[in-house]
């Protein structure tokens, strides 16, 4: 692996229906086996359900849900003299977004509704209302960082 140049960040194209780049990233993460059309259908149908439940623009709901899931701090392992410490560090904006998307998808997949559309819609509604597994994951991450605040001077 060459150390000369950092890999170039590729721009994702905005999605067809709403023209939103974050939504495209979300669909790409949701996609399994390269089936983008299936991922798009799941997201758009989930958005229709969300719009029916909350009577609000689904893209706004999506972004609000992501904001409620994004972590501000996380812990990273750091070895110091034979001991491993969990050191709290701030999360970069790109990683915040990536973690929020990943947690939202995993929380949706873990739910008990029948279809992925229902699960995703339910998790989005829960995230907007500060409930649900994805928000709990963020809260747990923040608690972990808070509990290990004593080791913050090991930050690098």
From Swiss-Prot:
Any one Gene Ontology BP term: translation
CDD domains tied to this protein: uS7_Bacteria
PROSITE patterns found in the cross-reference section: RIBOSOMAL_S7
GO cellular component terms attached to this protein's record: small ribosomal subunit
Keywords recorded for this protein, A-Z: Ribonucleoprotein, Ribosomal protein, RNA-binding, rRNA-binding, tRNA-binding
InterPro entries: Ribosomal_uS7, Ribosomal_uS7_bac/org-type, Ribosomal_uS7_CS, Ribosomal_uS7_dom, Ribosomal_uS7_dom_sf
GO molecular function, one term: structural constituent of ribosome
Keyword Membrane carried by entry: no
One Pfam family from the record: Ribosomal_S7
Taxonomic superkingdom: Bacteria
Task performed by this protein: One of the primary rRNA binding proteins, it binds directly to 16S rRNA where it nucleates assembly of the head domain of the 30S subunit. Is located at the subunit interface close to the decoding center, probably blocks exit of the E-site tRNA.
Subunit details: Part of the 30S ribosomal subunit. Contacts proteins S9 and S11.
Family classification: Belongs to the universal ribosomal protein uS7 family.
The protein, known as: Small ribosomal subunit protein uS7
Organism: Jannaschia sp. (strain CCS1)
Source organism phylogeny: Bacteria, Pseudomonadati, Pseudomonadota, Alphaproteobacteria, Rhodobacterales
